[in-house]
Amino acid sequence: MESQQLSNYPHISHGSACASVTSKEVHTNQDPLDVSASKIQEYDKASTKANSQQTTTPASSAVPENPHHASPQPASVPPPQNGPYPQQCMMTQNQANPSGWSFYGHPSMIPYTPYQMSPMYFPPGPQSQFPQYPSSVGTPLSTPSPESGNTFTDSSSADSDMTSTKKYVRPPPMLTSPNDFPNWVKTYIKFLQNSNLGGIIPTVNGKPVRPITDDELTFLYNTFQIFAPSQFLPTWVKDILSVDYTDIMKILSKSIEKMQSDTQEANDIVTLANLQYNGSTPADAFETKVTNIIDRLNNNGIHINNKVACQLIMRGLSGEYKFLRYTRHRHLNMTVAELFLDIHAIYEEQQGSRNSKPNYRRNPSDEKNDSRSYTNTTKPKVIARNPQKTNNSKSKTARAHNVSTSNNSPSTDNDSISKSTTEPIQLNNKHDLHLRPETY
């Protein structure tokens, strides 16, 4: 009987039944299924009475809302949670591509959040350590990084005191411009070193110290994807990723090569600006050094024209090469090759003069004899004095007395002069010059 009434009024009977059941309050711990037959009859009578009252109620009357009444609409059933991870922890497609990396394809759905690292990058210990990024995640590149935040918890302290406060690893800043990529990649490499991944960073020869694992490669890809948006990457980085969007190691290797190239460029510019040459080294070696520096700078995009190169070279010349500054300063179209021709000419002249000089040592007596004789370059007449004259010289009055006595004697001739103790001065007179006796 009751079942027929419930079938005739399914909605009303369902609501009435729920209202009667939910309005009851159970004050005991008795099992609700353990009910006697008399109790069941009482419930049936109460239900029949409630149904009769519902039939007399007008359809247009408003029924007050009872919070204990069940909703007549079907309840929404939550979708099943498939897999070992809860639904709220799974990453959506937008979360998987936080930086708009459509250029790199579809990254894998990692089960952990982008700001959480695997425990394999930390010192071993009985407790899993998951470093979490502080509130400075995503700061611009100009934000300074504190030194205190770039360290890890020591393994010994982690084993001894597991309740100590963990130190966080500051993540790299967000890349905001292609021009900032060289500076950004330095902070990213520092971030990998602080994450105990310094062994996978490529060295000078382009190879890492140790092989990289698949988990580490995934970590590189995910962190590079998060902090380096594709729209701010340089063209050469996009070219690498267009071939393999996971080849982050090649990007790091090329970045390190560019860092070394930039350092070499700075060294070449400093060397070229501080050139010094005085002929102490061969001119060929000096020319090779300068031309190699200029060629490297030109190949790296720093063009050094002939005018600037010649000015830098001439500014460093000294010694006998210094006059090249003044002989060539008016030549506007002078090339580096022409300047080195002049340098080679001076260097060869220096070497020739050094080879022509005698290498033996002169005797002191030769130097003494040379000091006593000299050649008069203004007059063709050469005067040679007798070295014994200084030892046997007489006074002027004695010589005059000898001359007067020789003139008074009848047998005086030119032979008497030759027999005198004082020898006359021998002159090589080519111009028929006569000297008075008083002059000698």
Curated annotation (Swiss-Prot):
Retrotransposons are mobile genetic entities that are able to replicate via an RNA intermediate and a reverse transcription step. In contrast to retroviruses, retrotransposons are non-infectious, lack an envelope and remain intracellular. Ty1 retrotransposons belong to the copia elements (pseudoviridae). Residues 429-440 have a biased composition (Basic and acidic residues). Capsid protein (CA) is the structural component of the virus-like particle (VLP), forming the shell that encapsulates the retrotransposons dimeric RNA genome. The particles are assembled from trimer-clustered units and there are holes in the capsid shells that allow for the diffusion of macromolecules. CA also has nucleocapsid-like chaperone activity, promoting primer tRNA(i)-Met annealing to the multipartite primer-binding site (PBS), dimerization of Ty1 RNA and initiation of reverse transcription. It comes from the Eukaryota. Residues 1-93, 126-173, 352-440 are annotated as: Disordered. The modification Phosphoserine is found at S416. The C-terminal RNA-binding region of CA is sufficient for all its nucleocapsid-like chaperone activities. It is found in: Cytoplasm. InterPro entries: TYA. Residues 299-401 are annotated as: RNA-binding. The record marks H401, N402 as: Cleavage. Residues 153-165, 402-418 have a biased composition (Low complexity). Residues 1-10, 48-60, 127-152, 419-428 have a biased composition (Polar residues). The keyword Lipoprotein does not apply. Pfam families: TYA (PF01021). Induction: Ty1-OR is a weakly expressed element. Induced under amino acid starvation conditions by GCN4. One of its GO terms (cellular component) is cytoplasm. This is Transposon Ty1-OR Gag polyprotein. One of its GO terms (biological process) is viral translational frameshifting. Homotrimer. It comes from Saccharomyces cerevisiae (strain ATCC 204508 / S288c) (Baker's yeast).
